[in-house]
């Protein structure tokens, strides 16, 4: 460890001074410097590069387990603990999660129009059986940008989304319209959301009724009833929007689009579906 420290910093301080400060001889250091590296050391160096490449490709969002899964997919045999060690050595840390901003109580209501039929069963045996929905907000210098999304619990794929400067019913309606357009008119589909006025609005309820969608809603004030949706928005903010400053809503809108359509759906490894991306999970299921 001492010789490694000297090798790393001898371009900053004189080698002799470093050796004296650490209590080692210059001869010993140069002998260590010229000895052949072990096979393990060479292997670690090659793997360090691949670990870092996977981490950076995820926009610095992957922890050791997802990086490890990336490497296994590429045919690189290595252990999870080794990946953890190499990430520590390079100070590669996934961004910490931030708390979601509290919702505006003026836009929520307590009167449910539907019971909680999902009942926290966040799995689906087939596509287009269970969709979950909600919206969140992203701050810009122009004000809030509201982001609505619809997720298929079968693959955790974002099948519909919408963005607007206001959180009117049209915001969530447009997200559901996109989901139906992408996936086709559903058959025996359960749609779960909270009790927000957007989802209880006549406009949104009529869209669901016209398409034969069964409505399910969380209990009042219980975020765990839609925990999978909360998890997606937490990932969006942790991995993309939470550490950025947007000058305009259009800039934020483009970045959210990029996160959903170019990273989350096609690339991001999801623990719930075996550490593959939503689109890859659907491909393996024969849907692509």
State what each model feature region is.
Residues 1-288:
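Charged DNA-binding/catalytic regions of mobile-element recombinases
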């Amino acid at each position: 460890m001492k010789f490694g420290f000297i090798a790393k910093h001898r371009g900053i301080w004189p080698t002799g001074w470093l050796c004296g400060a650490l209590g080692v001889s210059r001869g010993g250091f140069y002998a260590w410097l010229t000895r052949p590296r072990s096979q393990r050391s060479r292997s670690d160096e090659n793997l360090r590069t691949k670990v870092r490449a996977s981490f950076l490709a995820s926009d610095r969002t992957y922890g050791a387990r997802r990086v490890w899964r990336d490497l296994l997919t590429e045919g690189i045999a290595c252990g999870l603990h080794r990946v953890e060690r190499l990430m520590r050595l390079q100070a590669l840390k996934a961004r910490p999660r931030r708390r979601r901003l509290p919702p505006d109580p003026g836009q929520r209501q307590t009167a449910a129009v539907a019971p909680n039929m999902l009942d926290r069963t966040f799995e689906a045996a087939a596509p287009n059986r269970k969709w979950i929905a909600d919206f969140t907000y992203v701050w810009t210098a122009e004000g809030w940008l509201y982001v609505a999304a619809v997720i298929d619990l079968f693959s955790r794929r974002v099948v519909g989304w919408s963005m607007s400067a206001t959180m009117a019913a049209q915001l969530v309606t447009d997200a559901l319209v996109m989901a139906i357009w992408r996936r086709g008119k559903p058959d025996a589909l359960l749609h779960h959301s909270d009790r927000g006025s957007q989802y209880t609005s006549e406009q949104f309820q009529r869209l669901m009724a016209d398409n034969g969608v069964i409505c399910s809603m969380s209990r009042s004030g219980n975020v765990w009833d839609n925990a999978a949706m909360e998890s997606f928005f937490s990932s969006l903010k942790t991995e993309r929007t939470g550490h950025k400053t947007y000058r305009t809503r259009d800039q934020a809108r483009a970045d959210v689009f990029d996160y959903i359509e170019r990273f989350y759906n096609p690339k991001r490894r999801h623990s719930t579906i075996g550490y593959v991306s939503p689109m890859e999970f659907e491909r393996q299921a024969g849907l692509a």
